[in-house]
Each structure stands twice: as C-alpha cells, then as structure tokens.
Amino acid sequence: MADDSIFLIDIDKILKTKAGKKSKYIPRFVTSYLKRIVHQDELNVFLHDSKDKVGVEFLEACMEFLDAKVEIKGLENLPKEGKCTFVSNHPLGGQDGVALGYILGKHYGGNVRYLVNDLLMNLHGLAPLCIPINKTGSQSRDFPKMVEAGFSSDNHIIMFPAGLCSRRQNGVIRDLEWKKTFVTKSVETQRDVVPLHFEGRNSDFFYNLANLCKFVGIKFNICLLYTSDAA
C-alpha cells in the first residue's frame, strides 16, 4: 500500500483538524506531551507492522501488543443460534473493547460488529468490524439510520451502553447510567440481549482526574488520553 500514513496516529494533524487555525497557538511542549501520553510512536510502529491484518486477526494482534491476559468464564453459555446484542460494563476503555471483540469475534467467526465513534473507522484493521456512529457534527442526521442498519443486520452487535468507561462514584467504581437504546432496538429487531461482565479497573489517577474534570465542568473526555497507562 503506497501511503502507510493513513494507518498512523498524527497528533499534529488531529489538532489542526479539530482546532483549525487556532492550532498554531498550541505550545510545542503541549503537543509533545500529548504524543507521549498516547504513546504515538509505539502505536504507530504497531499499526505499521499490523497493517495487513483486519477484523479479528487485527484484534488478536492488539491483544498481543497489549500483552493482555484474559480469563474467560462461561464461554459455553454463549447462544448458538439467533442474533444477539452483547452488552457489557466498560471498566477499562479500549482494552476491554478489544478483548470482548476478539473473544466474541473468534467464537462467532468474525460475525460481530461494534457500534463505535466514527473516529475509530480510521483504524484500517478495525474498520470491517465497526458500524460508525456520531451524534454530533455533520453525521448527526444519519445517526438513527446507522443504528437501525446495525441492528437490522445479521451480525451480532457489541455495545457498551454507558458510552464512557467506568468512573468512581461515592467510592465505588461503576458504570455511568446505561442508555436504553440497546433494549429498544433489540426488541424491535428481535435480538436476544446477552449481558456480559468484565472485571478490571483503571488507576486511582484516572478516577481522580475524571472526578476533577466533572467538578470543574470540563466536558471533553480528557481521561481518554490516559487509559493506555491507567489499567
């Protein structure tokens, strides 16, 4: 493939896209810090090395890259027939998304799809398993159609109804309120809802930062930047 850059993370380009002309006022030390905390160089080496892997094979490569060790209980209880909506708590962020996609994708021969933020469609290896959704921006008008198309397909659906990974609330680590979309759409499309539970937690720094952002009213999900080091 001629242009490997389409697979790579480019913080400078992202800032220019999101901030426009204002991006030139962002101090260089800030962009350097962002590149470091998201592990841009390490991730780009991985993305380059795995550029020919797609779907479940790409998720398997992700598991190996993350050196993820997962203990699975109850695999024999997964439905053998029918279309399912698999819903799970979201304790870690990207890591549990990768793990569940790999486990279910391998079990069902790749016949699974995530409902995900459209930004993840930029990951070439993940894109075949994704149904892109975006409630904001130019794509917002198509959001209902995309959800409908996903649930009407023959693929199993993987969802994290909380939307964001778990937070510490009143000393207890738990999901935010689950959105009911998965229930209403599963009923409409005659899907079985299969609840899954993923055990894990992020660092105290992550939870403290999340609560601080909430306290001061920062709406941007800054904590997302730290999930790679928080688990």
Give the location of each predicted region.
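Membrane-anchoring hydrophobic helices of lipid-metabolizing enzymes
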Residues: M1-C84, G97-A99, G109, A127
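Conserved Motif II region of HX4D acyltransferases
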Residues: G82-H90, V147-G200
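A short secondary-structure junction signal
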Residues: G97-A99, G125-P128, D142-F143, A162, ...
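Short, electropositive alpha-helical surface patch
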Residues: Y207-L225
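Conserved small/polar residues in nucleotide/adenosyl-binding loops
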Residues: Y226-A231
